Amino acid sequence: MKDLFKIYSNYQPAGDQPTAIASLIDGLESGLAKQTLLGVTGSGKTFTIAHVIQAMKRPTLIMAPNKTLAAQLYGEFKAFFPDNAVEYFVSYYDYYQPEAYVPASDTFIEKDASINEHIEQMRLSATKALIERKDAIIVATVSAIYGLGDPDSYLRMLLHLSRGEQSDQRKILKRLAEMQYTRTNLSLERGQFRVHGDVIDIFPADSEKEAIRIELFDDEVDNIARFDPLTGEILQRLPRVTIFPKTHYVTPRERILETVEKVKVELQERLAELNAQNKLVEAQRLEQRTCFDIEMMLELGYCSGIENYSRYLSNREAGEAPPTLFDYLPPEALLIIDESHVTVPQIGGMYRGDRARKETLVNYGFRLPSALDNRPLRFEEFEERSPQTIYISATPGPYEQEHSDNVAEQVVRPTGLIDPEVEIRPVKTQVDDLMSEIRQVIAQGSRILVTTLTKRMAEDLTEYLSEHGIKVRYLHSDVDTVERMEIIRDLRLGEFDVLVGINLLREGLDMPEVALVAILDADKEGFLRSERSLIQTIGRAARNVKGRAILYADTMTGSMQRALTETERRREKQKAFNLKHGITPKGINKSVEDILEGAYIGKRKTMVAEQAPRYTHWSPQELAKEINALEKQMYAHAQNMEFELAAKIRDEYLLLKEQLMKI
């Protein structure tokens, strides 16, 4: 247990980090249920939590408000803990349209989804790590509170094999089929098995690159090995192996038969209700759909939308909470909720939206009433299942403030950087004054963020600044995550100097180059000008030594007053610490790829100029061969979440395709 978790880092805790770490550890050891880490932007909150995990030696679930932040946290924790099981658990849908019915237009929308195979593998790997290892760190989104396969059924479906044990080949193959693995005679893919004589090759659903080879001699397991399914190279001989099911929703045959009987009983009861209400179309529709599902379950052991029968499959009572990732957590686990001011309300809001959609499906005969139990956890159920919890935020919400038994402040940054100086200026001349400030900041080689209240104003301001010779871009809600990252990358590289937006509070906007944040119409009370939003927005300039914030307002609102008071309190504490310890604030000099996971590297034009000579004299055959090789490398890096490398190779790949088209 001594070195169960080991941090690899060139840095030691500094600033407020040592006291925050000690305070949180003391709270956990004292048995406090809920604590908050109040950490300002750029104070190294992730590093602090990593030290808490290392000290407590307990499996940890970290929840983030969205996939982008979860991916960033996953990358950071994987770098801190390379020897431990750092896993990623988010929704595996690239695209998801839930089934729904619109009574007004009599429109039924079938469930439509595109599943990301790699993320599905990572989800399976996450639950496997929780079952098998004590050193698991799972980074998840709100997907963690949604229904998952019952852990009891899942564990009953494991396939254990040991060298020297008696085991019939047909019995192993039958078990693999029950675990929803499919047989193939071609190349081995994830979730498949292949048979050659007495040799069974299995590519576990939770494995990214390695497959398992079982060699039988008569009815005895003669050899077990890990091998590379691409090259066939044996990597390691094993004394024993455990194969996990292909999906979380596998169920033993006897449970399927029990489920079918219960579904039949509920169907008859529901049909009687609908017929009594003279809802004949709904009754006929429900009978047809349910009977088809029953037939599929009896034949294959599963059906499309099997999760709608999860109440029976997990043997739970009506209204009882569904099994989720929390059911896989050991009792001694830790729960970390990042950006808790966003994540906690998000968790609280999931149940009602899901319920409203499903009630319509039940009322109009598309689903049985038991489908209502295939749902996310209600907030009170989430609270019941939560182990000891640490909330992380620069601006904790009312829930965290009310329920936390201890608040660890992390206001002093390891770099000595001080919160931005805040000025208030009149609204009447805000655009002209802003123009003057922008020109001064650009002359210093820095960047500017401007936040407006409406889309129209953002567009007009962008156009106005552009007409006056300022390189400006507008970040709006229609921009997807990848394009968003590319816009941020261009701002950091100086392709343009000013970024205008409405809500600049989302992830990925902590840029060291930003020296000025301008908040227009700061005195208009509302979500975008609340105390929490103002503090978060002001903090966008906190990574720059010369960081400033200007609030354009004619009156001092309560939110403004509280935000300014809190910012000033932090500044005083930071300055006092720096003075006491003789620290000179240092700017953060991070290269673009360090901060922007998902954005490609370098200037495209420069890259084209550099790469072109290398390929000038290549034949079409050589170019085509190189294009294929680069494509494979690109997808391999993307699968490993090495987005910067993947994007760099993508640029080269596109350049080569362009070159090939010219020949």
UniProtKB/Swiss-Prot annotation:
Record-annotated disulphide pairs: none
Keywords: ATP-binding, Cytoplasm, DNA damage, DNA excision, DNA repair, Excision nuclease, Nucleotide-binding, SOS response
Residues annotated as domain Helicase ATP-binding: 26-414
Domain UVR: residue ranges: 624-659
Function: The UvrABC repair system catalyzes the recognition and processing of DNA lesions. A damage recognition complex composed of 2 UvrA and 2 UvrB subunits scans DNA for abnormalities. Upon binding of the UvrA(2)B(2) complex to a putative damaged site, the DNA wraps around one UvrB monomer. DNA wrap is dependent on ATP binding by UvrB and probably causes local melting of the DNA helix, facilitating insertion of UvrB beta-hairpin between the DNA strands. Then UvrB probes one DNA strand for the presence of a lesion.
Similarity annotation: Belongs to the UvrB family.
Classification via Pfam families: Helicase_C, ResIII, UVR, UvrB, UvrB_inter
Keyword Transmembrane helix (UniProt): no
GO biological process, one term: SOS response
Domain Helicase C-terminal stretches: 430-596
Primary location group: cytoplasm
Chain span(s) of sequence motif Beta-hairpin: 92-115
Record organism: Legionella pneumophila (strain Paris)
Record's subunit section: Forms a heterotetramer with UvrA during the search for lesions. Interacts with UvrC in an incision complex.
Location(s), subcellular: Cytoplasm
Molecular function (Gene Ontology), one example: excinuclease ABC activity
Keyword Thylakoid among record annotations: no
Protein name as catalogued: UvrABC system protein B
One annotated Gene Ontology cellular component of this protein: cytoplasm
Amino-acid positions noted as binding ATP in the UniProt annotation, renumbered to this chain: G39, V40, T41, G42, S43, G44, K45, T46
